[in-house]
């Protein structure tokens, strides 16, 4: 009996741990201007909130080859990136208070890391979402699909 209870408790802990791990996404960037991985997927059911950890493994400083991670709908992504250019580095190349931005990190340079945690309640399973870098000129090639499942 005692062994069965311990087994059930152990399985519960492992299951909770597995769900927690899938709610933390590791994303890498470098001076070559691409995200690794290029597609991200989360489950709203398993992840009421998601943390994205962004790590820049390049060598250039953020004023020269900075990167951030920004999430918006695909329909809004180009307009957000364009508007961000005028906002400047002090504003992370994002218009302050822009409601089209679902989540974003700070701009980081080589050897730095940052993270953002956001709720998934407002996301739609099967919706069309894009993550991208809003640093000037990076949007054209530095973007990926953010897939939301139920």
Which sequence ranges carry the predicted segments?
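Extracytoplasmic/periplasmic copper-protein system
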Residues: 21-30, 75-94, 136-150
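Extracytoplasmic beta-sandwich strand-turn segments characteristic of Greek-key/jelly-roll folds
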Residues: 75-124
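Extracellular/periplasmic metallocenter environments
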Residues: 61, 103-150
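Sec/Tat signal peptide C-region and signal peptidase I cleavage site
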Residues: 16-20
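Beta-strand signatures of extracellular beta-sandwich domains
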Residues: 68-72
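N-terminal edge beta-strand
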Residues: 21-49
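Bacterial N-terminal signal peptides that target proteins for export
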Residues: 1-7
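Bacterial N-terminal signal peptides
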Residues: 8-15
């Amino acid at each position: 009996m005692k062994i069965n209870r311990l087994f059930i408790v152990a399985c519960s802990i492992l299951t909770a741990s597995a769900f927690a791990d899938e709610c933390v996404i590791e994303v890498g960037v470098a001076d070559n201007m691409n995200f690794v991985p290029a597609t991200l997927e989360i489950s709203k059911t398993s992840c009421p909130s998601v943390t994205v950890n962004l790590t820049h493994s390049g060598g250039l400083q953020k004023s020269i080859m900075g990167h951030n991670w920004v999430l918006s709908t695909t329909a809004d992504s180009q307009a957000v990136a364009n508007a961000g250019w005028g906002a400047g580095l002090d504003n992370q190349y994002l218009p302050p208070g822009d409601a089209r931005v679902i989540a974003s990190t700070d701009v980081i340079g080589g050897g730095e890391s940052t993270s953002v945690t956001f709720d998934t309640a407002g996301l739609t399973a099967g919706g069309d979402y894009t993550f991208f870098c809003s640093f000037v000129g990076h949007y054209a090639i530095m973007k990926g699909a953010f897939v939301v499942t139920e």
